[in-house]
UniProtKB/Swiss-Prot annotation:
One of its GO terms (biological process) is protein refolding. Belongs to the chaperonin (HSP60) family. It catalyses: ATP + H2O + a folded polypeptide = ADP + phosphate + an unfolded polypeptide. This is Chaperonin GroEL. It is an enzyme of class 5 (isomerase). Signal peptide: none annotated. One of its GO terms (molecular function) is unfolded protein binding. ATP binds at residues 29-32, 86-90, 413, 495. Gene3D superfamilies: GroEL, GroEL-like equatorial domain, TCP-1-like chaperonin intermediate domain. It comes from Thermoanaerobacter brockii (Thermoanaerobium brockii). Together with its co-chaperonin GroES, plays an essential role in assisting protein folding. The GroEL-GroES system forms a nano-cage that allows encapsulation of the non-native substrate proteins and provides a physical environment optimized to promote and accelerate protein folding. Keywords: ATP-binding, Chaperone, Cytoplasm, Isomerase, Nucleotide-binding.
Amino acid sequence: MAKQIKYGEEARRALERGVNAVADTVKVTLGPRGRNVVLDKKYGSPTVTNDGVTIAREIELEDPFENQGAQLLKEAATKTNDIAGDGTTTATLLAQAMVREGLKNLAAGANPMLLRRGIAKAVDAAVEGLKRISKPIDNKESIAHVASISAADEEIGKLIAEAMDKVGKDGVITVEESKTLGTTLEVVEGMQFDRGYISPYMVTDAEKMEAVLEEPVILITDKKISNIQDLLPLLEQIVQQGKKLLIIADDVEGEALATLIVNKLRGTFTCVAVKAPGFGDRRKEMLQDIAILTGGQVISEELGYDLKDVRLDMLGRARQVKVTKEYTTIVGGAGDPSEIKKRVNQIKAQIEETTSDYDREKLQERLAKLAGGVAVIQAGAATETELKEKKHRIEDALAATKAAVEEGIVPGGGIALLNVIEDVQKVVDSLEGDFKTGAKIVLRALEEPVRQIATNAGVDGSVIVEKIKAAKDPNFGYDAYKEEFTDMFKAGIVDPTKVTRTALQNAASIASMILTTEAIVVDIPEKNTGMPNPGAGMDMM
């Protein structure tokens, strides 16, 4: 297919127009008085959102050269969202500011490679500055503040703080759509997996149709159990000690299942059997997780164990096990805390290494089940459009809160970036020529978020920036919601350090890429010739 090419200034200006198309659409959503953007959907009702990355993903431009710029900026937003889960609008805005200033300097004859190195030096100084002013976040109130600001809703903030308090920072918190109007929180303690009892005859509470075993022993195996002879030696020991038994196996069927049910109905002993969770290699890993959590061993031929040889001390133990038709929950596993910690660290290392989003999600789930628990926030609203928008906000707030727990918090409202201007100024003063010009590009861009938040609130951004700079107080800033100057930390207006840092680094990366671009190659769009005319006059036979 033939290509068309643009070079030099013409190419960069096309990229800039693409960047502006995305940034101008996204930046109206910044801050507490940011506006919404309506996204057209081919089917169904339009989506109303103020989430930067959701808006950016929808934008495709007709001009292929400009579209390259739009796609590059989208990358900055998406990368920020993937790493920090929030800050996409800030990243977009910073990148636009750096591209605008950079192109002015290139037009004046600056060397793009030196500009790039100047930008990198300035960003490094800004990141160090952010680390310096960052404060750790450890109490429930601070967590609620961060979540409330991201979601622009105090109620959601409190729910997220409550969820994180219950399941810990390694726990999994998921957001689901509720069938009711209200937004609620549900917490599952211990390890839960999506497998229920093999037979309804195993229930201990016929009214609720669930089996609850107090202080049971747990047989964990990857084998299919169909012959009761394999289990007899173990069952005799369990009956003698009056224990209750949970079997987690590949399957329990035939004679073995019938015998277990008959003995349960006669009241000889209580036993519940469930199928092992997961599939393939993931099943082996999950069985090992359960074994470590309960202090038992996986009975597997791979490890040289046979069911006939199982002793009581090889079984896991827990405070309580609850089994419903669909789920099994193990609470208070009796595993060795140091072994559990080792396993948690091993899963964390795998999360760092994996490149697959699906694998990462599954590893996060396993980590949560071992480390804390699972919390589900049920988002409810009056209409489907409102529900989608609310779910988006909760997911954003959740990501921002996790980022805050990881790296701490800085004053919000764009003030943190103004606070690191001094750090960047020192770098600017130490450089010369185009290096210095590159660092100055970042210096100017750092003011942009405060300026835009103020503009969205209907006030003059430049006046606000100058007032904040003149105050010389690191926590002094502009509360756009109340339209007043205040101490940002005291007012609870804070941003996660990780979000601000990631937004700045990704914006600089994309801006540097655009400034050092010398040519763009795109396909020449094919002319649509239309469908060939079918043979006329042919009767249908």
